């Protein structure tokens, strides 16, 4: 099947108008077109600068594995496999073969990872199971089992011809009315009032309402036409195909992955396809100083063979499959694949209205293509993410990723660790430090162990806070654990912990209609008078939790929003979107994150310490909970808000950056015990406080999450209120599951069962040092949420009993 056979309209005229224009004709663009058409939207034009599949699709390896660490991506890949199975029965089949996949462990640590993955596969109903060495050999007879500890087999994984897949989806889209125009180069994207309005090509201009950038390795270049930065880098990715030698009448072998040796195999006709992830990565047409500059004529082309970088992969392949040493090589593929800084897709609407992106497939785009097309079509037609897509949402990449150096260094680090075992609380090391708190030097001098989040250096804990090792968790949870966290936790519960939260995002909303705008955006009543602070959610149209933050009224028409470190770009993007789409153009939204430091002081002695530094009255009567006012410390006027994220008396202090470092030192000298973010995590988990992106996201509503107290009883016209009114009787609820053994710490994604039936999965977990328990959050069917209900949770293949606690 060729492009011309699919299109049969090579010389057709470009339309002057379409509702949606898709740029890019690889598996991403054709999947978006296919799914839009399947959902009834056929006023769609797809354009490609060359032939369909001429970018990265044609040289993809075509392996389809479904299980991923992210639950949403797993669901997307499951849709892909289901779709490819269905397309195989169509008039334009994509050569889908459901051969199954084997993953082997060449180390005991990898076998632990496999057993953990088998556990979370149960929560999706996927048939992933451990297999013996004998069965590994039966399913992949060429393997040398030396050093293999064990393995697992996924029955419904498979492989597909990438080009035929794209053409199959293109054919399906065309049948429903989508127009496809190849050899049509995009020159300009026009905007009006912050929204796309037209796509200018070398064949003419198409007026449109929506543009979807599926440009593959060219996606960043296309985005620059509207001044949007997409942090992707084309990376050299290599594999080879051997000469034919297998019996053409034998069943196709399962694919094989040996991550400890960085390699993968699948059958290609009667030969083998073998590739891997080199420890020495190489970017293409990108440097630390410049953006990508891909040649205009790079179509249906490959890069030069780089055997020096591939040498380790080749040697490992011959060790694992000795036959490789005897086989001739039919072709060696070195093709550029677009990677992102965290090895996840880059999807969604950008800061330019109705300009969407679906790019950065990180060499697993064939497995994800079907799911990408589905969620993007739903996102476009529904005007918001259809499920929890945060880990793939372009809004997760903040201003730091406008830096070519930061983006490239992080992408190379992650590429080289692609097949590593990733333990909890693992930290990336590239391009650090990038952003720091005003008190950074003090923290460094006092033995702070830093972590990084959204390019900010943050204190995890202080190494000189040495405690007992007796509570070190079992297994993986203990890998990056520190006894310092327990000391800092106790210091906060019993005295006063001081926390540098300067990385928290601060958004200022102002204007004559700022109050009206925020009352529309937020589910809670946020306008309670100057000096009042409110905890609230912002909901999507389905009643799901889009944002979770506090709002403080600074003046009649000026408000300060405090949200998580990683959510500045996301939350600001949501506010800008609602402002643009609902007629609040006169409202200003400004990011003040780098202008203000935030220090938290919490614990029973916090008032005593803070009162010693200010003449302002901090008594309960003068300074109630959720109130905010200016106070003076050391001759500096700062804002103090009585609020807590750890369940103790305390304040957050908002301080101009230039004045912040001396105030931190005063808090310390006055008796504050310096603590890090890992103590915050333990403290808030113990008190049942929630984190967006952890326990709450767009897939859950406030009633399910136990946040009904943060929903207004007075108004019914806030965004998402209509949907929320029908969700007051949830069928599932968020619960805490407690384990009496504090060292039995859940990591997340573990299956939960009752009476041998899987009923859910763990969302997050940790240690509660005050209660001396291990604690987890999970959403469970309502009949299992009664406090005291006993449940089993699987840890690395072994079931342990916990029970539902009172929240």
Give the positions of each predicted feature.
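Glycine/proline-enriched, intrinsically flexible loops and inter-domain linkers
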Residues: 387-388, 394-807
